[in-house]
Amino acid sequence: MKALNIEDPVVLCRATDHIAEQIAFIADLERKGFTYATGDGIYFDTSRQPDYGFLARLDKAGLQAGSRVDIGDKRQATDFALWKFSAPGEKRQMEWESPWGKGFPGWHIECSAMAEKYLGDWFDIHCGGEDHIPVHHTNEIAQTEARSGTHLANFWMHGYFLIANDAKMAKSSGDFLRVATLVDRGYDPLAFRYLCLTGHYRTQLNFTFEALDAAQTGLDRMRQGFHALSATPKASPDAALIERFTDQVNDDLNLPRALAVAWETLRGTLPAPTKRATLLRFDEVLGLGLADWRPQAVEAPGEVRALAEARAAARKARDFAEADRLRGALAELGWEMEDGAQGYTLKQR
């Protein structure tokens, strides 16, 4: 996470450390009349929730909600397990005592119990993957709202899958992207972050190394452009650009358009210190580490150094035609020469 410039979470909680909270949650649902028992567990009665399934926009009759038992043991196909009984005579690796007998929690109750403990009955934003919409989050909403009588979250934000070469990534197939793999191939991990910024979170992002190459190039150019900007202590961000950037972020987290505003700023005509201050403010959201980046020193080949010396001599002799020719020769080799009061500097393009 550090390599991708992702902040650490404030709380990392384990479901197995919160069994008591899950049992208390189920017991409260039972007291409110939202549960019933079958031969293999305690189930949530979705018929008690008239708007069950609204998040997924699905008909209750067509929604198969993570059932662990045959429909014959449940009142509705959408009903789901809150607590499962351990099989008689069998010892499970993970099982706990409860008011209903020895067993273990269902698939969804842990999230409601831990969210309630650390965030309260009602919070602003709930995130998850697109695959959580039809079952897991639908059931989480049902059980939490049944207990609390309030909405679980004001906003639901579901990230769509990262796919590779037009196929879903899967550990089982070995086609699973790791940061270490990118580093081993010579990529900056923040190039992957840049790539993610180019796609909206509610669209699937197709990962290819060609796309990562383009992202690395874009990141390098933004870093180099930022690094070339002069700074003054009193420079302030441009208020109009900050407003435009913020509007894009507030528009369903439209980071591709926010990134476009950053590029427009870098290429625009504002004074360099204002550009720099504005981009620094943007990077508090984009997280590309612009202020921390430093260009790596690259030793120019002998041929390049010789051309640079020849151009410096031609410029000193005021042979500008020859100086321009030599500058072009340097460019063909992928180098550029910047003149200054103390001489020249060479930069690889």
Model-derived features with residue positions:
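Divalent metal-dependent hydrolysis catalytic cores, especially in the metallo-beta-lactamase
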Residues: 2-15
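Short, well-ordered coil/turn segments that N-cap beta-strands
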Residues: 6-9, 31, 253-256
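Alpha-helical recognition segments enriched in aromatics with Gly/Pro capping
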Residues: 8, 19-230
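Short, hydrophobic secondary-structure boundary micro-motifs
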Residues: 9-10, 38, 324, 339
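A generic secondary-structure micro-motif detector
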Residues: 12-15, 101, 130-131, 300, ...
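Aromatic- and histidine-enriched alpha-helix N-cap/loop-to-helix transition segments
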Residues: 17, 106-110, 253, 257-260
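Structural preference for alpha-helix termini/caps and helix-kink/transition segments
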Residues: 167-171, 175-349
